[in-house]
């Protein structure tokens, strides 16, 4: 990867990217609240389970397909995978999360004038823009290789999950970094699965996670919006 592409990838993966990722836990806060996650071992188990059962089998594969669609400027594919991703957000919090973050990143891309008029039209043609669509657009217009963009997305997701555990379990800073290091091989496997999974095998079937998300909507005390 060229240095410029690497720098763009680091910017897209940075916690300082102004899309509000830090304000969401994707159900993890509810799992901490009910005692499912209460220490470093439980945190690692939770993150790995969600990574392989949900993220690697749906969110990452959809991002991979959107990266290809924007690269080839395939308007029909962009629309189809965007709509499919939104339809798969099965709770109010999960849907609001991806739409808010996608809108913020899409607006940032527009404000920074990333991409030509044809590319921008592909993005703006979507009724709603979830995060994977905006992220794919940003990566393609910044010429970040698809494989790197996919791994960057997975790392950002894992880092955010670890930060939730550090704040809410709570875990120490060293434990958080140890946990993040221990996830590297798992992230590589998830990236490979996302690239190889056929369309008919994509699935976000995770009823337990969905129930936790719904419980989180009425959780009395919380730090996160999901």
From Swiss-Prot:
Annotated InterPro entries: UreF, UreF_sf
A GO term from the CC aspect: cytoplasm
Cell location: Cytoplasm
GO molecular function: nickel cation binding
Keywords of the record: Chaperone, Cytoplasm, Nickel insertion
Role summary: Required for maturation of urease via the functional incorporation of the urease nickel metallocenter.
UniProt subunit comment: UreD, UreF and UreG form a complex that acts as a GTP-hydrolysis-dependent molecular chaperone, activating the urease apoprotein by helping to assemble the nickel containing metallocenter of UreC. The UreE protein probably delivers the nickel.
Protein name stated in the entry: Urease accessory protein UreF
Organism: Janthinobacterium sp. (strain Marseille)
């Amino acid at each position: 990867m060229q240095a410029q592409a690497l720098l763009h990838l680091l910017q897209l993966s940075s916690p300082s990217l102004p899309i509000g990722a830090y304000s969401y836990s994707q159900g993890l806060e509810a799992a901490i609240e009910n005692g499912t996650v209460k220490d470093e071992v439980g945190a690692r188990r939770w993150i790995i389970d969600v990574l392989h059962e949900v993220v690697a089998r749906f969110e990452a594969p959809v991002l991979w397909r959107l990266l290809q669609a924007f690269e080839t400027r395939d308007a029909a594919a962009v629309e189809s995978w965007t709509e499919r991703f939104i339809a798969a957000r099965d709770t109010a919090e999960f849907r609001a999360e991806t739409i808010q973050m996608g809108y913020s990143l899409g607006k940032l891309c527009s404000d920074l004038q990333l991409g030509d008029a044809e590319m921008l039209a592909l993005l703006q043609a979507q009724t709603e823009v979830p995060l994977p669509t905006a992220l794919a657009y940003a990566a393609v217009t910044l010429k970040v290789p698809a494989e790197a963009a996919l791994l960057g997305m997975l790392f950002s997701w894992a880092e955010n999950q670890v930060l939730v555990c550090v704040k809410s379990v709570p875990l120490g800073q060293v434990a958080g970094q140890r946990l993040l290091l221990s996830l590297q091989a798992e992230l590589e496997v998830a990236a490979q699965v996302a690239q190889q999974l056929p369309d008919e095998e994509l699935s976000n079937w995770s009823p337990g996670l969905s129930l936790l998300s719904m419980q989180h909507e009425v959780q009395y005390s919380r730090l996160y919006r999901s």
